[in-house]
Amino acid sequence: MTKRIAITPGEPASIGPDLVIKLAQQAWPVELVVCADPNLLMTRAKMLGLPLQLRPYQPSQPPKPQTAGTLTIAPFTLAEEVECGVLNEANSAYVVETLRYAGEKNMSNEFDAVVTGPVHKGIINQAGIPFSGHTEFFALQANCADVVMMLAAPGLQVALMTTHIPLAYVAKAITRDRLHHIITILHRELVSKFGLGSPKIYVCGLNPHAGEDGHLGREEIDTIIPALNELREQGMDIVGPLPADTLFQPKYLEQADVVLAMYHDQGLPVLKSLGFGKSVNITLGLPYIRTSVDHGTALELAGSGKADCGSFTCALNKAIELASKSK
């Protein structure tokens, strides 16, 4: 059965619309429902010199594979005309509304996944709309207490124990309860959405050399190791904690389905050095599939035709893959 994937281009003055139009230049085995202002897409396509036809979204009809040069449109209306590369807080509510719609329709199973383009958090907050990011927005909308951020690149998947918090707060944020919660979500999602029977999770230590038997920090001894042992007793296949400076090498990565890093800059620099532009942000713990690009708005490239749609293509391919596997 053909899947139906929602796409939100994100910030209208950014490269988001450009990338969606570039995606449309090839055929896809799914229906791509773009939540956007149709005039924005047609104007940007003309600017890029690329062919584009929009067909209206008809939820009562079965989804059809997307033919090259076409997109299915769920129409929204911008408050003001867009100038490429120029942020306008008047259009912030439009951006948030496209996200709200995509989330609602995924929760009602009208869509099989959502792929999100880059947004500009600053301009949304400047408009008086509290917004800390896609992940938090969708989690709040779906009433999810916790979600897990995971980035995937060819040959490596890295999930994060903590995300966007100062390094000084990381150690206190790593508790037995939180380790239980995050790893349980990670394990469950790898089974249900990735189709893995018994996922192997490799876990980084927090301290250099994973604490070196307590000489370089006791978090491993007092918190991480006891929590991992308790999770192993539940049948989870967990390796670690291992020193982060040695974990990211082929002899471990070839065995791992995912690496759990303790903090943002412990795991993501390695992943992005291996696959920047080819990595995908995946939110685990939502009641639906959400993938995203691994880059920002690149306002200076909007409308120029120079934006690379590699990450958006990877995000869409990953969403299609997960939608086909999801139980």
Curated annotation (Swiss-Prot):
Catalytic activity, reaction form: 4-(phosphooxy)-L-threonine + NAD(+) = 3-amino-2-oxopropyl phosphate + CO2 + NADH
A GO cellular-component term linked to this record: cytoplasm
This protein's record includes keyword Nucleus: no
The protein's Enzyme Commission number: 1.1.1.262
Listed GO biological process terms: pyridoxal phosphate biosynthetic process; pyridoxine biosynthetic process
Obligatory cofactor(s): Zn(2+); Mg(2+); Co(2+)
Binding positions (a divalent metal cation): 164, 209, 264
Binding residues for substrate: 134-135, 272, 281, 290
Pathway it works in: Cofactor biosynthesis; pyridoxine 5'-phosphate biosynthesis; pyridoxine 5'-phosphate from D-erythrose 4-phosphate: step 4/5
Entry function: Catalyzes the NAD(P)-dependent oxidation of 4-(phosphooxy)-L-threonine (HTP) into 2-amino-3-oxo-4-(phosphooxy)butyric acid which spontaneously decarboxylates to form 3-amino-2-oxopropyl phosphate (AHAP).
Family: Belongs to the PdxA family.
Protein name: 4-hydroxythreonine-4-phosphate dehydrogenase
Species name: Shewanella frigidimarina (strain NCIMB 400)
Source lineage: Bacteria, Pseudomonadati, Pseudomonadota, Gammaproteobacteria, Alteromonadales
